[in-house]
Amino acid sequence: MSFPKGFFWGGAVAANQVEGAWNVDGKGPSVADVATYKPNTDVKDYKSHVAMDDAHIAAAMADPDDTYYPKRRGIDFYHHYKEDLALFAEMGFTMLRVSIAWTRIFPTGEEAQPNEKGLQFYSDLFAEMHKNGIEPLVTLSHYEMPLALATKYNGWVDRRVIDCFAKFCHVCFERYKDQVKYWLTFNEVDSVIRHPFTTAGIIPSRVPEDKMLETCYQALHHQLVASAMVVKDCHDIIPGSKVGCMLTKLTTYARTCAPDDELATQAKNLENLFYADVHVWGEYPRLILKMFERKGIHVEMLPEDAATLKAGCVDFVSCSYYMTMTESVDPNAERTPGNTVLGVKNPYLPSTDWGWQIDPKGLRYSLIELYDRYRKPLMVVENGMGAKDVVEADGSIHDPYRVEYFRQHISEMGKAIDEGVEMWGYTTWAPIDLISASTNQMSKRYGFIYVDQDDMGNGTLDRSRKDSFYWYKKVIASNGEELD
């Protein structure tokens, strides 16, 4: 197993899950700031956790507290980033994926001028990253947008949001052109279908149920057009820049070799891949357009959109990978949740406490599939497992389950490289404990670094190294050769 020289090793976080300081230095409210922690809701009931309507938004904005709105506080990375970057550097990180909070730069999304304090924060962050030998990989939209655009326009459903986003991105490219080379446009762009408010600011209660799917695809189209526009803008402003797309890689297996199961599985995989298809090839696959037609889905596309998509193709493909799915036409097949998706349970795979099935070989399968399809360099920019960690009396945190998870996944990633897949880097989700995207929990811990904070926001916020911290440090130092 041989990882290439210069391979990027690191971790990934999102502004809305780590920064906190939700109303500090001119930042406006984002859709993430009204996401609620629901302690009495089953953690596997993802649909209930991501539900949203106007009444909920109004109640949230009337409540200045952050107790039940954990993304308002995050882990206070806004004030702790130097400490955290020093820990990442100690592990040997050569890349850190972060996102820029749109509402730090344009609080409502429609200001004439950007917020200088917000711009300066990221200038300082990127400078500190370079000081620590860490290359920034920056996501421009990671599960947040100005709440004002969601309530005024129903988010990305309205085409006017494209120009708001393009302006935000243009400002970022101009400001950080000497600090950031690697960019991603939208995080898990496919997830608008699964959680429309989180991903695209769509308030579901405003949309008739029989029009919800069409509405999601309309918002998605606007995001795809916006992505193409900003890819071209980035290339124009930053010579040598590399801009990628990012999808949730949900490879689906057939439960049986029955032809009906195989056909259902094929449909799932085509759906999962089409989001990257548009980013890479600059056009919608014919099979997807026919699917729209069969389902009576009308997506309004302007005549000039085709040329825009063609002119803004990405340089590389990135993905999150947590699990695989299984498909069956049998309505009685046992099902299991995971990553906001309900699928058929795979009897050959173990599961996390949150129902996510663990499949290291599925990562290898997925990377080979992606590279064979696109012939573009790949990055895995999210991979990890949420678990409940225990702090021992002496302060130590033993997490052999996390080490084993990463050992197996990194091993399979290395095998994919040996088989010919071109990969640029790997950033784990997440290198430090943070607020969960779906359930808004703190107790669902991903990090190599423990953060002393509970689900209700109690704790010192002190950082401490888990056993996995030292293990990943060894992996990076050996460029992936030492996994024991």
Give a label for each model feature.
Residues 66-80, 157-159:
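Active-site mouth loops of central-metabolism enzymes
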Residues 1-65, 89, 108-110, 119-484:
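Active-site region of glycoside hydrolase catalytic domains
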Residues 80-101, 311-317:
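Catalytic domains of carbohydrate-active enzymes, especially glycoside hydrolases
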Residues 100-114:
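Glycine-rich, proline-tolerant flexible connector loops at the mouths of alpha/beta enzymes
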